[in-house]
Each structure stands twice: as structure tokens, then as C-alpha cells.
């Protein structure tokens, strides 16, 4: 009986120990889940973008990736190429100066660098701004300074939209220029055709027997002839001639006899 009682007590003790162990595991599980959730929150990283305002000649995305990778993980890099007009102008200036073409014919004006962590991007932009690009003495970018700016709340999708908008504006400007050039060409061709028809109708001015015809304003004699040709115009013309002769005779008599003209005598008191 004693042995049976001891066995029962041992079984009860074992069952109590198992229950305590399960309760302890149940208490540890929410703590583990809380730790895992906090670790996930800590591991959530937001990327940041740094704007590169100055890109020296022969500076490529590979160079900026190699230089900035020492401070943090670098993601995507994009450089904006210079305009084709500027590129052609540089080539023309180099050809006029007798210089050989550069090995790297393509240069860039600005760039964007994406860091995996925005905190690293802020730190890099704050620490490297206005500092030399190249640390070595033989570096070709030693005398160029970093021009960095952290873009707050700026994502890569914003950059893609901005570049797409610029491309659309460039296409619209190109279409407008092409339309303007077409209008000017059509206007020139129309003028050429009109000139050819004009020369064919009136003759070529370069030939000695040809002549140009132009409509001019009629003279005073032509005006009088037209008025006289109208009904009653001859009588009016005769009366006008008589009045002119009388006016001239009156002035001649006044000069001979020294008498004032009738109009002058009326005006004087």
C-alpha cells in the first residue's frame, strides 16, 4: 500500500511539473512573437535618394558607385546625359580648334543615387557635400567637389515620372519645331510658284525686250479728263477754267493799279 501511494504521488508530481512547463511555454510564446515583431519593425528599411548636382567630365555611374559604396549599400544609379545640341556644339568647337575627339564623347549633367537605407543617404549627403571627389593624388576628380543633396520623401517612381514628363515635353517641342519648319517651307514654295507664274505672264525681266507693268496713281490731267467725260462735265470744266482766268486777271489788275483785292478790302476795316 505504501508503494502504491508513493507511485500515485510521483505521478501527480510529474503531471504538475508537465502542466507548469506548458504554462511557462505559453507565457514565453507571446514574448517571442513580440520580439520577432519588433525585430521585423527594426529590419524594415526605407531607401533614400541623393541628388548629384555636378558631374565632372568622364565621370560615369560606375565611378560614383565605387566611391559611395564605401559608406553604404548603393542601389540604382541614373545619370542625365547632356543635350544633343550641346554635344554637337562641343564637337564643332573641338574640330574648329584642331583638337582630337575625346575618348569619352558622352558627358552627363546631373545624377541620382539610391541608397538602401535613407539614414545612410542623409549621412552621406551631409558629410560629403563640398568635399573633394577623389582622395588619391592621381585621381582625375581630385579637384572636383561633391554637390550632394538628400531628397526628402523622394522615391524612384517620382524620378521615373519626372523623366517621362521631360521626354514628353521634348517630343512636343520637336513636333512644334518640325511643324514650324514645314510651314516656312510651304510658304517659300508658294512664293516661288507665284513668282514663276508672274514671270510667265509678264515676261522675264532679265530679257531686253521684256517689260514690267504696274498700276500707278492717275495724274491731275487724267482726273480732269475723267470728270470732263462724265455727263455735264464739260460745262463744269469750262466754268472752272473761266473762274481760274478771272482770278488770275483780277490779281494782275491789282498789281498794275495798286488797288487791293476785293477779298482783302473786305477783310480790312
UniProtKB/Swiss-Prot annotation:
Domain of life: Eukaryota
Keyword Coiled coil among record annotations: yes
GO biological process terms on file: regulation of transcription by RNA polymerase II; spinal cord motor neuron differentiation
Acidic residues composition-biased segments: 16-32
InterPro entries named among the record's database cross-references: ABT1/Esf2, ABT1/ESF2_RRM, Nucleotide-bd_a/b_plait_sf, RBD_domain_sf
One GO location term (cellular component): nucleolus
Tissue specificity annotation: Ubiquitously expressed.
Principal place of residence: nucleus
Disordered, as annotated region: 1-40, 220-244
Location of the protein in the cell: Nucleus; Nucleus, Nucleolus
Domain RRM positions: 48-145
Keywords carried by this UniProt record: Coiled coil, DNA-binding, Nucleus, RNA-binding, Transcription, Transcription regulation
Gene Ontology MF, one: RNA binding
Leader sequence segment: none
Coiled-coil region: 5-29, 164-194
Record bears the keyword Coiled coil: yes
Function of the molecule: Could be a novel TATA-binding protein (TBP) which can function as a basal transcription activator. Can act as a regulator of basal transcription for class II genes.
Family as reported in the entry's similarity comment: Belongs to the ESF2/ABP1 family.
Subunit field text: Interacts with ESF1/ABTAP. Interacts with IGHMBP2.
The name this protein goes by in its record: Activator of basal transcription 1
Source species: Mus musculus (Mouse)
Amino acid at each position: 500500500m505504501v508503494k502504491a501511494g508513493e507511485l500515485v504521488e510521483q505521478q501527480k508530481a510529474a503531471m504538475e511539473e508537465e502542466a507548469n512547463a506548458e504554462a511557462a511555454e505559453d507565457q514565453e510564446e507571446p514574448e517571442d512573437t513580440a520580439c520577432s515583431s519588433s525585430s521585423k519593425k527594426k529590419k524594415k528599411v526605407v531607401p533614400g535618394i541623393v541628388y548629384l548636382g555636378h558631374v565632372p567630365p568622364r565621370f560615369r555611374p560606375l565611378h560614383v558607385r565605387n566611391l559611395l559604396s564605401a559608406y553604404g549599400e548603393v542601389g540604382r544609379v541614373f545619370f542625365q546625359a547632356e543635350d544633343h545640341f550641346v554635344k554637337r556644339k562641343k564637337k564643332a568647337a573641338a574640330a574648329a580648334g584642331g583638337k582630337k575627339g575625346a575618348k569619352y564623347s558622352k558627358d552627363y549633367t546631373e545624377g541620382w543615387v539610391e541608397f538602401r537605407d535613407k539614414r545612410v543617404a542623409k549621412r552621406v549627403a551631409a558629410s560629403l557635400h563640398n568635399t573633394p571627389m577623389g582622395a588619391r593624388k592621381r585621381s582625375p576628380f581630385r579637384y572636383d567637389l561633391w554637390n550632394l543633396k538628400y531628397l526628402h520623401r523622394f522615391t524612384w517612381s517620382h524620378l521615373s515620372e519626372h523623366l517621362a514628363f521631360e521626354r514628353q515635353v521634348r517630343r512636343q517641342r520637336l513636333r512644334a519645331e518640325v511643324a514650324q519648319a514645314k510651314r516656312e517651307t510651304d510658304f517659300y514654295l508658294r512664293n516661288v510658284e507665284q513668282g514663276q507664274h508672274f514671270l510667265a505672264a509678264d515676261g522675264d525681266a532679265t530679257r531686253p525686250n521684256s517689260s514690267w507693268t504696274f498700276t500707278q496713281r492717275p495724274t491731275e490731267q487724267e482726273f480732269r479728263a475723267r470728270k470732263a467725260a462724265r455727263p455735264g462735265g464739260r460745262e463744269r470744266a469750262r466754268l472752272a477754267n473761266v473762274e481760274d482766268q478771272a482770278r488770275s486777271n483780277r490779281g494782275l489788275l491789282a498789281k498794275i493799279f495798286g488797288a487791293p483785292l476785293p477779298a482783302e478790302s473786305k477783310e480790312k476795316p
